[in-house]
UniProtKB/Swiss-Prot annotation:
Belongs to the acetyltransferase family. PAT/BAR subfamily. PANTHER family: ACYLTRANSFERASE FABY-RELATED (PTHR43072:SF8), N-ACETYLTRANSFERASE (PTHR43072). The keyword Transferase applies. SUPFAM superfamilies: Acyl-CoA N-acyltransferases (Nat) (SSF55729). Keywords: Acyltransferase, Antibiotic resistance, Herbicide resistance, Transferase. Inactivates phosphinothricin (PPT) by transfer of an acetyl group from acetyl CoA. This enzyme is an effector of phosphinothricin tripeptide (PTT or bialaphos) resistance. It catalyses: phosphinothricin + acetyl-CoA = N-acetylphosphinothricin + CoA + H(+). This is Phosphinothricin N-acetyltransferase. Residues 26-189 form the N-acetyltransferase domain.
Amino acid sequence: MPSSSSHPSTPDAPQRVGVELARCACTVRVVRDDDLPAITAIYAHHVRTGTASFEEVPPDDTEMRARCAKVLDAGLPYLVAERDGKLLGYAYATHYRPRSAYRFTLEDSVYIAPDAIGQGVGRTLLLTLIARCEGGPWRQLIANVGDSGNTASLGLHAACGFVQAGVLKSVGFKFGRWIDTVLMQRPLNAGDTTLPE
């Protein structure tokens, strides 16, 4: 698996990350430049058809490349799942907020290709992402789930050790209706039981 010294590394083998890793016949690896067209297409599908993302116009390939580079340049994990050369989904972490007191908190994003939903890809990606995040100094991982009716994402995060931390009512408006966001949270490493070094 390609890695860089600036990115936390963990083995490719399935790991225990608070819960048992789902069995998915796929390979999880670090993103490569040639993955971006498929990533752009997957995200565009979710922007156009769902409420997981509050974007309403899908970003183009140039914008998606810039976003990916920003994650990697920050030393944060950006992963893809593939099977037989086909990209099934992707997941990455970003800093939760830009102000310095948030420096030990990350936010996750997970998007799955429409024809790979329900195959354990999301769980495999998210658990691997959690393991990568635990390879760094971070202490909390936040999921900002678009739409309180998004049972797939809520269930995925709950299965991976997240708990609901709050609901922001009607903060989005898409497809002619108001949409909530659900904040979910999971500790990384020792969480808040110890002070960071």
